[in-house]
Amino acid sequence: MAWTLLLLVLLSHCTGSLSQPVLTQPSSHSASSGASVRLTCMLSSGFSVGDFWIRWYQQKPGNPPRYLLYYHSDSNKGQGSGVPSRFSGSNDASANAGILRISGLQPEDEADYYCGTWHSNSKT
């Protein structure tokens, strides 16, 4: 009986800690040089964007992904090394989405952009 209870406690803890949202991004986005663009990373229902750190990556053909930035709140955000300040993050709570804004678009910004999350209670 004690082993069964311990196993159930461990399983429920592990199941909860592994639960992650499904992330949805638009398939494509186009804009002109000099314009600003807003890319979204929507979390699935049952999850709140405010509980997660959103990370953004840029990938150009033939290259590995480049880490751009993370965003959790205005007081908890960070820019990757060498990433210009025209790349910025935010959250849109009404859309339950993380946002990557690129201002002053340049030709070299043409790339694939990916988001990822980690939970605010995570220690890793």
Swiss-Prot record:
Region (Framework-2): 54-70
Alphabetic keyword roster: Adaptive immunity, Cell membrane, Disulfide bond, Immunity, Immunoglobulin, Immunoglobulin domain, Membrane, Secreted, Signal
Disulfide bonds: 41-115
Region (Framework-1): 20-44
Chain spans, region Complementarity-determining-1: 45-53
Region (Complementarity-determining-2): 71-77
The Ig-like domain, residue ranges: 21-124
Signal peptide from the UniProt entry: 1-19
Main location: secreted
Subunit text: Immunoglobulins are composed of two identical heavy chains and two identical light chains; disulfide-linked.
Protein name: Immunoglobulin lambda variable 5-52
Organism: Homo sapiens (Human)
